[in-house]
């Protein structure tokens, strides 16, 4: 057991029998009252978010989640099936993949990480940087070029992203999966 003050951002705590990711933790100590920790939490099972205040010495149980490398095997409607190197398959619904869904597409070769809680897969994490192909974009508006000019582009799976003005149809681009931002042009994956 750790105290609330010892828990760090991006660690996972077991609260009421469910794993919660600590997205933000702010320690505050006032002169008269005891120290407190304000936390922004995300439930890893259902995706709900909450903000809670704990006393700095409240006990919390840290959780170590198991992770395993997987690849997307196939998509069947709202079901996404991933397979590990031992050919075990793991099926997840679209709502379980909400944060990474815009970057998942049929036939992708990115090595992902399945996240397990108590032997059950609860989500999949993509690599920090992925490569995708632009299937549609328009010409950038000329004239307003005092800063970085961005224009909308559509990826193969229908996701729209802002890209640099020089990106054309069929170009391959790098995307940061943490915030969905365009990083630059690149070569097609081998």
UniProtKB/Swiss-Prot annotation:
> What Gene3D superfamilies does UniProt report for this protein, alphabetically?
2.30.30.30, Nucleic acid-binding proteins
PANTHER family xref list = ELONGATION FACTOR P, ELONGATION FACTOR P (EF-P) FAMILY PROTEIN
Q: In which pathway does it act?
A: Protein biosynthesis; polypeptide chain elongation
The record's comment on protein family reads: Belongs to the elongation factor P family.
InterPro entries for this protein:
Elong-fact-P_C, NA-bd_OB-fold, Rib_uL2_dom2, Transl_elong_fac_P/YeiP, Transl_elong_KOW-like, Transl_elong_P/YeiP_cen, Transl_elongation_fac_P, Translation_prot_SH3-like_sf
Question: Coiled-coil segments, which residues?
Answer: none
Q: Please verify whether the record's keywords include Protein biosynthesis.
A: yes
Any Pfam family from its record, for instance, is EFP
What gene codes for this chain? efp
Where's it mainly located? cytoplasm
Protein name per its UniProtKB record: Elongation factor P
Q: What GO biological process term is on the record, naming one?
A: peptide biosynthetic process
Q: Which UniProt keywords apply?
A: Cytoplasm, Elongation factor, Protein biosynthesis
Gene Ontology cellular component terms for the protein in this record: cytoplasm
The answer, when asked if Transmembrane is one of the entry's keywords, is no
Source taxonomy = Bacteria, Pseudomonadati, Pseudomonadota, Gammaproteobacteria, Pseudomonadales
Drop me one GO molecular function for this one.
translation elongation factor activity
Purpose: Involved in peptide bond synthesis. Stimulates efficient translation and peptide-bond synthesis on native or reconstituted 70S ribosomes in vitro. Probably functions indirectly by altering the affinity of the ribosome for aminoacyl-tRNA, thus increasing their reactivity as acceptors for peptidyl transferase.
Can you say where in the cell this protein is located? Cytoplasm
């Amino acid at each position: 057991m750790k105290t609330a003050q010892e828990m760090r951002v991006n660690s996972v705590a077991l609260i009421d029998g469910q794993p919660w990711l600590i997205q933000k933790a702010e320690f505050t100590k006032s002169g008269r009252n005891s120290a407190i920790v304000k936390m922004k939490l995300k439930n890893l099972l259902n995706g709900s978010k909450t903000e809670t205040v704990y006393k700095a010495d409240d006990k919390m149980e840290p959780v170590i989640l198991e992770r395993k490398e997987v690849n997307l095997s196939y998509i069947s409607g709202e079901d996404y099936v991933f397979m590990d190197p031992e050919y075990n398959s793991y099926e997840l619904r679209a709502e379980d993949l909400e944060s990474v869904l815009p970057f998942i597409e049929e036939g992708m070769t990115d090595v992902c990480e399945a996240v397990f809680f108590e032997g059950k897969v609860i989500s999949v994490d993509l690599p920090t940087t992925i490569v995708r192909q632009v299937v549609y974009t328009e010409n950038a508006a000329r004239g307003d070029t005092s800063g970085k000019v961005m224009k909308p582009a559509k990826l193969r799976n229908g996701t729209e992203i802002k890209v640099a003005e020089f990106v054309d149809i069929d170009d391959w681009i790098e995307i940061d999966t943490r915030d969905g931002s365009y990083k630059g042009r690149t070569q097609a994956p081998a």
